[in-house]
Amino acid sequence: MPKRPHVDGRRQFSDIPDGMETVERVVTDEKIAAFRASIANELVLAPLTKGGNLPFRRLCVDLGCNVTVSEMVFARYALKRNPVELARLRRHESEKTFGVQIATNQIAEGVNAGRLAFESGADFLDLNCGCPIHETWKRGLGAKLLKKPAKLERLVRGIADGVPLPLTVKI
C-alpha cells in the first residue's frame, strides 16, 4: 500500500467519507513523535473492560501509573449520546496522559468518536482489536477485526487520518 501523502509534515485527510468535515487541528509527524516519547518507559494501564473505570484509574495514578486508558467505549452508542458510554470518556485531572479506547468497525464512526474523545480531553485514541467478548465479536468489533486484515488496514488508516489525536491499536 502506498504511503500517505504528506505536505509540510501534516497528514492529509484522505479516505474520509463524504459529508464529513475535516478538523482544524491535524496530527503532525512531530506530534506523533512527541507522543511516543511521552509514553516511552512509562507505566501504562492497559484498557480494562469493566475494570478501567475512573475511580480505578485514579487509584492506579496514585500508585505511579502515568498513562491511563478508558474502558472500551462503543463508538456507535457514544455518538448517540448514551450516558454510560459518555461517562467512560471522563478524565480526572490527576491523569497525566489519558487515552480513550473505542470499539468500531466503521471509519466515519471511529473518526467521529475520536473527535468526541478529543473534545473530552483525551491525549490519544486507541482502537480495540483484541477484545474476545462475545458481544463485540458478534458485532464485528474487537478481535473479530483481525479476521479481515484489509478492512482493518482501511479502518486504521481512515481513523488515523481523520482524528486530531495519535491513534494506537490494541491487539
Regions found by a protein language model. Name each.
Residues Q106-E109, P166, I171:
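Active-site glycine- and acidic-residue-rich loops that bind
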Residues Q101, D126-G130, K170:
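Short beta-strand segments
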Residues M1-G19:
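Mixed-charge, low-complexity intrinsically disordered regions
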Residues M72-P83, C129-P149:
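Glycine-rich, proline-tolerant flexible connector loops at the mouths of alpha/beta enzymes
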Residues P17-A33, L48-D123:
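Glycine-rich, positively charged N-terminal anion/phosphate-binding segment
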Residues I39-N41, R58:
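Non-catalytic, substrate/partner-engaging modules appended to enzymatic cores
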Residues L86-Q101, G142-V169:
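Alpha-helix-loop-beta-strand connector modules within alpha/beta enzyme cores
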